[in-house]
Amino acid sequence: MGARVLISEMWYYLAICGMDPMLSAQTLGVIGGFNVLGSLFFGWAGQRWNKLALLGGIYVFRSLALAWYFMLPPTPGTTLLFGAIMGFLWLGVGPLVAGAVAELFGLQWQAMIQGLAFMSHQLGSFMGAYGGGLIYDALGSYNLAWRIGVSLGLAAGIIQVAFALIRPTRPPLAAPA
């Protein structure tokens, strides 16, 4: 719930905090720039370390960044720093998921399984954005949405790291020609 609520609701969150909603556009730009760096870094890191553990680490650090940002009163500086952190961690899942799918299931089914993995991410994004809006409409505050986002992210990260520790990785098997 956390990351998607951030994109769809940040402009409104900043406005109700008395900040210029244009800061939301600037933050989205920072997120986009750091997405590139994070994707490159995690692609590199996934070649060297356990991809599943790295994925779990991303989920945990996203949640910690979300908790940090919403525990503080927002300022332009903290908002842009938060955007940089989230951007670095956001799309870093792409190369890790692709590599993990290849290692876990082989290359023969990679396109289908990777498609299902990203479809589930998109369904989660929809539920997060829509759910965050519903929570705000019902309660007049995003606090519960942030707490749910942090809790789900921490749980996902811990489960992912635990799974990484019990499941050994293997090189992907070649698909038949």
Name every feature range the model reports, one short phrase each.
Residues 1-42, 128:
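Extracytoplasmic gate region of multi-pass secondary transporters
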Residues 39-50, 136-137:
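Helix-to-loop junctions at the C-terminal end of transmembrane segments
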Residues 92-105:
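Intracellular juxtamembrane helix-capping segments at the cytosolic ends
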Residues 150-177:
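Multi-pass alpha-helical transporter architecture, strongest
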